[in-house]
Amino acid sequence: MAPKKKVAGLIKLQIQAGQANPAPPVGPALGQHGVNIMEFCKAYNAATESQRGNVIPVEITVYEDRSFTFALKTPPAAKLLLKAAGVQKGSGEPHKTKVAKVTWDQVREIAETKKADLNANDIDAAAKIIAGTARSMGITVE
């Protein structure tokens, strides 16, 4: 096995799938670590092409020799909930004003999608986490 490379930094970004470009926030975040920005943009866009329309979080590990690897995460629960509810944004005052309703089936479906990134042992626990996110956005779960 090759000797381990020394990690120089870890960058976390949320970028639209298939739309990474050198403009902020991507350019400055990668530039300060000396990463080839266009190389990352091409690799990210190729990896997320099938998920266009979603925001895909990415964790970029930068090594001392300026090479990098990246891991894609699942879209944020809030974005998935907004899409399921069919609204643009959550409530300004979530416990007073409710903006939409989602069913438990929709919540379970989102939990299935997010399971890899959630700190839950089973789908029921994951669904409760998603339901809590919905509640804090002013979305009612039925």
UniProtKB/Swiss-Prot annotation:
Keyword set includes RNA-binding: yes
InterPro entries, per database record: Ribosomal_uL11, Ribosomal_uL11_bac-typ, Ribosomal_uL11_C, Ribosomal_uL11_C_sf, Ribosomal_uL11_CS, Ribosomal_uL11_N, Ribosomal_uL11_N_sf
UniProt keyword terms in alphabetical order: Isopeptide bond, Methylation, Ribonucleoprotein, Ribosomal protein, RNA-binding, rRNA-binding, Ubl conjugation
Any GO CC annotation of this UniProt entry: cytosolic large ribosomal subunit
Gene Ontology BP annotations: translation
Post-translational modification: One or more lysine residues are methylated.
Cross-link (Isoglutamyl lysine isopeptide (Lys-Gln) (interchain with Q-Cter in protein Pup)): 101
Cited CDD domains: Ribosomal_L11
Record-level Gene Ontology MF annotations: large ribosomal subunit rRNA binding; structural constituent of ribosome
Subunit structure: Part of the ribosomal stalk of the 50S ribosomal subunit. Interacts with L10 and the large rRNA to form the base of the stalk. L10 forms an elongated spine to which L12 dimers bind in a sequential fashion forming a multimeric L10(L12)X complex.
Protein family: Belongs to the universal ribosomal protein uL11 family.
Purpose: Forms part of the ribosomal stalk which helps the ribosome interact with GTP-bound translation factors.
Classification via PANTHER family: 60S RIBOSOMAL PROTEIN L12, LARGE RIBOSOMAL SUBUNIT PROTEIN UL11M
Protein name in UniProt: Large ribosomal subunit protein uL11
Organism: Mycolicibacterium smegmatis (strain ATCC 700084 / mc(2)155)
